């Protein structure tokens, strides 16, 4: 049976896991790391880099290196949080035709799901390399407080990456699965405090044994989808920029290269200050003016960092208190607090969590891997490998429609267990009204305009009648992914209209199909490029071995024979400069045949010693070619950077 992988698609880092023999296992990426930076870069020679390789070259390629894209997914360009982000990132955020926030690289506009799909494609490829088989299905996690548009956009990203997304689950719920699979813990009420790279979630979850099943019931959830480690980094960057402006009179905001260097240094400084009291940010040649180059040197203490981010940490208090209230619990009722997300490693955050819940948070759950592990467990449930687990998640925000006077009438309240269905009958607002517009909303405010608009559709051909007489039945149906379907039916005629909510923005079916095709083409280009590089590396090894043999034999090679070999060498070098893999392989074979005779002669003349050495070179260029490829290719790319 095909494997379903579990993916934590994070703002800063992503992680992939699988269930093996009933146990979850995090899969290392091709670089040997257990997490992959959620960074995608486009180079000058049209190469797409993902993960660590993209992060390494970010400083020299800031405008074409995309990070924290998850903060834009499913968002409108005019959103305040997007406008704030535009000022702080070195890449270009633009408004798409449908009003969504997209990015622009090299004159090409791209949707956030398209960029996230690149990260998913790498995770998929790494999982396939580990499993030795094709992966087609995945469970992907999202912040619990993601709205419908953001969930749909995440599902679109999976589809573009060639994955059938079997389930979208909430990150804190996944972390609870990872923590609570140890059945010896008994019945518990836990709080999952998830402060990641770009989002904050708090979920109150009850773990219990019910009729022999291990039941995970989400009692409530709350959060902030624009609060995370990236904001902590930005506070450090702003502080450094202000200090430098005071000292040098230069504003580094206008220099993308300087901003990228500052971002990297801010992240390192923040991490260092979790284990030390002071660090130094030292960036020589950060910029220059008419008087010459300028160097940046700023000392940052843990106390100063805590002062800079205090209000960000305090912003998590409100959602925590609301989640407890919605669950009908007090902090004393919570048995354990689980920390998820890299930002929870900050001592001040841990102190704050202890203050809110009155207990030490647990440190035995890996904050970087727990979510992916939970996703893998849910994948095991869907795949039938895990049989005694029941997961009851909730919808994070209320759902309803706009009614007379611009009011939002709720059909499904927040924290309702999903999947769920709700039906309500409405009528017309005017006499002889023959059509109604159903405006679908998500949020907690009273007025429609203050909530998130998910979409609109019309129900027409209603028979003329006085106002209030027609009966229009509106049904909201939320699936297990938290994605909404809405239908409206005229009870008199039976006429029905329905939509799967794709937001008033979002990607159209045609756009998704185009992006899927682009991704497939890109994968084919990757394969061809890999084969070409393998052929070049093999050829390079044969050239090296042949030159060495010629040098060692010296004047023992006849002029005619040397001329033939040198001609073959030059032909191969010419081919290596081009992109014709078949030609390179053909000329490599020709040179190998000619140089093989030389190797035999050298072996005979020198008693086998030098000959065996030469022979080993040929093997390096032959059957071992694939081993040579990655190492040499990586070095070349590093040099290019």
UniProtKB/Swiss-Prot annotation:
Single Gene Ontology MF annotation: ATP binding
Induction trigger: By stress conditions e.g. heat shock.
UniProt keyword list: ATP-binding, Chaperone, Nucleotide-binding, Phosphoprotein, Stress response
Matches recorded under Gene3D superfamilies: 1.20.1270.10, 3.30.420.40, Actin, Chain A, domain 4 (3.90.640.10), Substrate Binding Domain Of DNAk, Chain A, domain 1 (2.60.34.10)
Feature: compositional bias, Acidic residues: 627-641
Domain of life: Bacteria
Ranges of compositional bias, category Polar residues: 603-613
Modified residue annotations for Phosphothreonine: 199
Family named by the database record: Belongs to the heat shock protein 70 family.
Protein role: Acts as a chaperone.
Protein name (database record): Chaperone protein DnaK
Gene this chain is encoded by: dnaK
């Amino acid at each position: 049976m095909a494997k379903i992988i579990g993916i934590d698609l994070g703002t800063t880092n992503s992680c992939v896991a699988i269930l093996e023999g009933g146990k979850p296992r995090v899969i290392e990426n091709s670089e040997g790391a257990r997490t992959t930076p959620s960074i995608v870069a486009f180079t000058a020679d049209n190469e797409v880099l993902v993960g660590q390789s993209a992060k390494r070259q970010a400083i020299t390629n800031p405008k074409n290196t995309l990070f924290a894209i998850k903060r834009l997914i499913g968002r409108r360009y005019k959103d305040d949080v997007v406008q704030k982000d535009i000022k702080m990132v070195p890449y270009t955020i633009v408004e798409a035709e449908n009003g969504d926030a997209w990015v622009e690289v090299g004159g090409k506009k791209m949707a956030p799901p398209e960029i996230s799909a690149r990260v998913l494609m790498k995770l998929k490829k790494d999982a396939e390399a580990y499993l030795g088989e094709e992966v087609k299905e995945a469970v992907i996690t999202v912040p619990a407080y993601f709205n419908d548009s953001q969930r749909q956009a995440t599902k679109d990203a999976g589809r573009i990456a060639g994955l059938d997304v079997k389930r979208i689950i909430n990150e804190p719920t996944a972390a609870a699965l990872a923590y609570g699979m140890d059945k010896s813990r008994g019945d518990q009420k836990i709080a999952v405090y998830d402060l990641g790279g770009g989002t904050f979630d708090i979920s109150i979850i009850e773990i219990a044994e019910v009729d022999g099943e291990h039941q995970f019931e989400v009692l409530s959830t709350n959060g902030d989808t624009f609060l995370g480690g990236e904001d902590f980094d930005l506070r450090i960057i702003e502080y450094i920029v202000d200090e430098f402006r005071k000292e040098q009179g230069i504003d580094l905001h206008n220099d993308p290269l300087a901003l990228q260097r500052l971002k990297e240094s801010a992240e390192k400084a923040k991490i260092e200050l979790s284990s030390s009291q002071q660090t130094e940010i030292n960036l020589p040649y950060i910029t220059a003016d008419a008087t010459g180059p300028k160097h940046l040197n700023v000392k940052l203490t843990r106390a100063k960092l805590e002062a800079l981010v205090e209000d960000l940490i305090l912003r998590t208090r409100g959602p925590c208190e609301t989640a407890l209230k919605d669950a009908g619990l007090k902090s004393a009722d919570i048995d354990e607090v689980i920390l998820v997300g890299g930002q929870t490693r900050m001592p001040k955050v841990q102190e704050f969590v202890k203050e809110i819940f009155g207990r030490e948070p647990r440190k035995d759950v890996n904050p970087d891997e727990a979510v992916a592990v939970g996703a893998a467990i849910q994948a095991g449930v869907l795949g039938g490998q895990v049989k005694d687990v029941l997961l009851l998640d909730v919808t994070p925000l209320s759902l309803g429609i706009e009614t007379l006077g611009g009011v939002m009438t709720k059909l499904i309240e927040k924290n309702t267990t999903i999947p769920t269905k709700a039906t309500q009958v409405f009528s017309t607002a005017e006499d002889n009204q023959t059509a109604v517009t159903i405006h679908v909303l998500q949020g907690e405010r009273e007025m429609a305009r203050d909530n998130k608009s998910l979409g609109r559709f019309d129900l027409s051909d209603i028979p003329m009648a006085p106002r209030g007489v027609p009966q229009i039945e509106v049904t909201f149906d939320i699936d297990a992914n938290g994605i909404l379907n809405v239908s409206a039916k005229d009870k008199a005629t039976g006429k029905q209209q329905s939509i799967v909510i794709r937001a008033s923005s979002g990607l159209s079916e045609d756009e998704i199909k185009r992006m899927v095709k682009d991704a497939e083409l890109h994968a084919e280009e990757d394969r061809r490029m890999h084969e070409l590089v393998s052929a070049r590396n093999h050829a390079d090894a044969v050239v090296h071995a042949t030159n060495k043999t010629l040098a060692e034999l010296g004047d023992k090679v006849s002029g005619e024979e040397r001329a033939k070999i040198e001609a073959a060498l030059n032909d191969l070098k010419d081919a290596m400069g081009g992109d014709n893999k078949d030609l390179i392989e053909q000329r490599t074979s020709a040179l190998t045949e000619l140089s093989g005779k030389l190797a035999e002669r050298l072996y005979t003349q020198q008693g086998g010693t030098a000959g065996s050495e030469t022979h080993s070179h040929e093997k390096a260029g032959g059957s071992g070619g694939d081993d040579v490829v990655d190492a040499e290719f990586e070095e070349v790319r590093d040099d290019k950077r």
